[in-house]
């Protein structure tokens, strides 16, 4: 049996960094090297201030960094020395050419494959960690076969990650399952068993699933599509609840107690974000269209359409509640990350809500406890979001929630940070213009509505009528836009 003693991971991002840190932590006899072309990112991994925020990550890294966990820009040497190479690079949605806006861009995967074969001799296991379309492993193998050399034996596996940002370390230490896909040949199965042995250091054998390569690749896309579908489904019900007087939380509890349905991912909100859900669902849509399955493609496209609708609907509600105009009005945006306990802003609903309000001339004062000012500016300066001067003219980054809300017409909660439940809302109300509005896009203030109304707030929340005198709104009038639109200008910083 092949014994893995040295691991190289290409890509030091949200997947590669935490995953390999946990592997090093759980397998002290294995030397793990995480490499990246981004020198600043590697320097951050080697510093006290890690490049990403994730609860528990710092403690894991510090327990083994410099012992059996290393971060480096020396990619070629790390590949040459490794028994196993993880490919954990970005697979963004294409912004140009065929499949624009839906297909995955595999240029970084291809670059990794070419670099691996160039720097490899003998036997090596190459493992997809990035989310890729079905049969991406076949493309990697074709590159290997076309560049083979004497005694070179590269085995390709699929080992998708199922971690969630904000709970990544917990998910990695105690996964629901580990999925490993490989060729159904003796050589392929030998590679599968070798990778299984790494995870068996801490994962029970019954939680390690082995499949063929294509099933493993599709399982990752399907899992994210199903989770996104759940969110869009409950968000569609939230619109119905607001129209009828029902409470979406009560409806979610009622249906979630049905064991056939379950209660996870039934939290209505302003919409899902993050690097995976939209990208992977669109990739699935494109795959279905390419395979001449238009009905299946349209089905999954509706998951994205509902998410877009929920964001536009929420923004319309803000505008209409503020007497049908937000022009020159100060609005506090609390939360910019796509979810709590992470600093990741990719596809964050806060970007979309900010875009809609900026287009109406609102002055936004934004606060997030983990997203740096520079990242907010870059995100809002994306070509699909703002005009050249909009960010500098309409956006202020606040140092705390109280500063953001001072003199505001409304505060809008876009991220479910726990700290937003503990704010001194009497203090905030005194400093806001009246009537003072709260738009709770994450329902973090459930249970506080009576108290907040007593203070004097007008409250609007997802999936429930709270304020007794609410101005009717007409959802869907805001035009769509996408962060996947091809750039025609450079972002400002």
Swiss-Prot record:
Binding, NAD(+): 11-16, 36, 41, 89-93, 130-132, 165, 276-279, 346
One GO MF term: NAD binding
Activity modulation comment: UDP-alpha-D-xylose (UDX) acts as a feedback inhibitor. It binds at the same site as the substrate, but functions as allosteric inhibitor by triggering a conformation change that disrupts the active hexameric ring structure and gives rise to an inactive, horseshoe-shaped hexamer.
N6-acetyllysine modifications at: 107
One Pfam family in the UniProt entry: UDPG_MGDP_dh_N
Function: Catalyzes the formation of UDP-alpha-D-glucuronate, a constituent of complex glycosaminoglycans. Required for the biosynthesis of chondroitin sulfate and heparan sulfate. Required for embryonic development via its role in the biosynthesis of glycosaminoglycans. Required for proper brain and neuronal development.
Domain characteristics, as noted in the entry: The protein goes through several conformation states during the reaction cycle, giving rise to hysteresis. In the initial state, the ligand-free protein is in an inactive conformation (E*). Substrate binding triggers a change to the active conformation (E). UDP-xylose binding triggers the transition to a distinct, inhibited conformation. The presence of an intrinsically disordered C-terminus promotes a more dynamic protein structure and favors a conformation with high affinity for UPD-xylose. The allosteric switch region moves by about 5 Angstroms when UDP-xylose is bound, and occupies part of the UDP-glucose binding site. At the same time it promotes domain movements that disrupt the active hexameric ring structure and lead to the formation of a horseshoe-shaped, inactive hexamer.
Identification of the protein by name: UDP-glucose 6-dehydrogenase
Organism this protein belongs to: Mus musculus (Mouse)
GN (gene name): Ugdh
């Amino acid at each position: 049996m092949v014994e893995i003693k040295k691991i190289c991971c290409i890509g030091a991002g949200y997947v590669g960094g935490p995953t390999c840190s946990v592997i090093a932590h759980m397998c002290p006899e294995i030397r793990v090297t995480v490499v990246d072309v981004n020198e600043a990112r590697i320097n951050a991994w080697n510093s006290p201030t890690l490049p990403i925020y994730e609860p528990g990550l710092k403690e894991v890294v510090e327990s083994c960094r410099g012992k059996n966990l290393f971060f480096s820009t020396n990619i070629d040497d790390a590949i040459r020395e490794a028994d196993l190479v993880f490919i954990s690079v970005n697979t963004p949605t294409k912004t140009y050419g065929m499949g624009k806006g839906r297909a995955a861009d595999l240029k970084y995967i291809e670059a990794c494959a070419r670099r691996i074969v160039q720097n490899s001799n003998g036997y090596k296991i190459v493992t997809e960690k990035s989310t890729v379309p079905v049969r991406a492993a076949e493309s990697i193998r074709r590159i290997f076969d076309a560049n083979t050399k004497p005694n070179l034996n590269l085995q390709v596996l699929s080992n998708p990650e199922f971690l969630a940002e904000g709970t990544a370390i917990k998910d990695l230490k105690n996964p629901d399952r580990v999925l490993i896909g490989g060729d159904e040949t003796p050589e392929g199965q030998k590679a599968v068993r070798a990778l299984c042995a790494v995870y068996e250091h801490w994962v029970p054998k019954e939680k390690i699933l082995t499949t063929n390569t294509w099933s493993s690749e599709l399982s990752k896309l399907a899992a994210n599509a199903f989770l996104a579908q759940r969110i869009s489904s409950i968000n569609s019900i939230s619109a119905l609840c607001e129209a009828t007087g029902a409470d979406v939380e009560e409806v979610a509890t009622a249906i979630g107690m049905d064991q056939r349905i379950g209660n996870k991912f039934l939290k209505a909100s302003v919409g899902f974000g993050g690097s995976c859900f939209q990208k992977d669902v669109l990739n699935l849509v494109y795959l279905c269209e390419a395979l001449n399955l238009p009905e299946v493609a349209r089905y999954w496209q509706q998951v994205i359409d509902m998410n877009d609708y929920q964001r536009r609907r929420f923004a319309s509600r803000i505008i209409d509640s503020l007497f049908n105009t937000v022009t020159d009005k100060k609005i506090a945006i609390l939360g910019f990350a796509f979810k709590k306990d992470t600093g990741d802003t990719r596809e964050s609903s806060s970007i979309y809500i900010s875009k809609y309000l900026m287009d109406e001339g609102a002055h936004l004062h934004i606060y997030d406890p983990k997203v740096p000012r520079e990242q907010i500016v870059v995100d809002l300066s994306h070509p699909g979001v703002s005009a050249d001067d909009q960010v500098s003219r309409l956006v202020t980054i606040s140092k705390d929630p109280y500063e953001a809300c001072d003199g505001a017409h409304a505060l809008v909660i876009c991220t479910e940070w726990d700290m937003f439940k503990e704010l001194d809302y009497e203090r905030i109300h005194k400093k806001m213009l009246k009537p003072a509005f709260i738009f709770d896009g994450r329902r973090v203030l459930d249970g506080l509505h009576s108290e907040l109304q007593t203070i004097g707030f007008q409250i609007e929340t997802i999936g429930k009528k709270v304020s007794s005198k609410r101005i009717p709104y007409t959802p869907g009038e805001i035009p769509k836009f996408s962060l996947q639109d091809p750039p025609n200008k450079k972002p400002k910083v």
